[in-house]
């Protein structure tokens, strides 16, 4: 028989630090450079990235020796409900006894700074920068008026 996902419990202070409900939540809006503080950005703009996705956050955390969980949740300040803007990542910050799970990341801000610094180095981000060359090399139209169509100025027409 297949095992089910453990039932979520309501949060209480008596929960242990390794319970899923005590893990910290990270939404892509927290590290999005295009968001304002009012729209949910948590870090300074110079430390953020443009339009991160929860998949990119997952890719960074998977190599960072942290325990995390993906959830299909929508950020409450996000206006769009499209699938590309959905997603939340829960990260374990502390062990059962309250000690840090990973000494490199003592706070939630340190985890977000690490994620924001590593996302631009992902291969998916490096491939996107090469597309600007193809957009600029569009054919130019000839403005010499020797073509058909009888150039000249056209007025607004008669007012009726």
From Swiss-Prot:
One MF annotation (Gene Ontology) recorded for this entry: 7S RNA binding
Signal peptide limits: none
Keyword Transmembrane belongs to the record: no
Gene3D superfamilies xref list: Signal recognition particle, SRP19-like subunit
Location in or out of the cell: Cytoplasm; Nucleus, Nucleolus
Gene Ontology BP, a term: SRP-dependent cotranslational protein targeting to membrane, signal sequence recognition
UniProt region (Disordered), positions on chain: 122-160
Keyword list, A-Z: Cytoplasm, Nucleus, Ribonucleoprotein, RNA-binding, Signal recognition particle
GO CC annotation, single: signal recognition particle, endoplasmic reticulum targeting
Electron transport among keywords: no
Polar residues composition-biased segments: 123-143
Superkingdom of the organism of origin: Eukaryota
Intrachain S-S bonds: none
Main location: cytoplasm
Function: Component of the signal recognition particle (SRP) complex, a ribonucleoprotein complex that mediates the cotranslational targeting of secretory and membrane proteins to the endoplasmic reticulum (ER). Binds directly to 7SL RNA. Mediates binding of Srp54 to the SRP complex.
Subunit structure: Component of a signal recognition particle complex that consists of a 7SL RNA molecule of 300 nucleotides and six protein subunits: Srp72, Srp68, Srp54, Srp19, Srp14 and Srp9.
Family: Belongs to the SRP19 family.
Record protein name field: Signal recognition particle 19 kDa protein
The species this protein was found in: Drosophila melanogaster
Name of the gene encoding the protein in the UniProt record: Srp19
């Amino acid at each position: 028989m297949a095992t089910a996902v453990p039932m979520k419990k309501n949060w209480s202070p008596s929960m242990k630090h390794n319970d899923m409900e005590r893990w910290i939540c990270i939404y892509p809006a927290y590290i999005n450079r295009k968001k304002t503080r009012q729209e949910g950005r948590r870090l300074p703009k110079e430390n953020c990235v443009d339009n991160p996705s929860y998949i990119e956050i997952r890719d960074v955390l998977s190599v960072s020796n942290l325990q995390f969980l993906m959830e299909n949740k929508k950020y409450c300040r996000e206006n769009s409900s499209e699938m590309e803007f959905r997603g939340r990542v829960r990260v374990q910050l502390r062990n059962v006894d309250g000690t840090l799970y990973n000494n490199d990341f003592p706070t939630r801000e340190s985890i977000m700074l690490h994620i924001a610094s590593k996302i631009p180095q992902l291969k998916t981000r490096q491939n996107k920068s090469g597309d600007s060359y193809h957009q600029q090399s569009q054919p130019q139209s000839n403005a010499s008026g020797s073509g058909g169509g009888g150039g000249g100025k056209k007025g607004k027409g008669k007012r009726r």
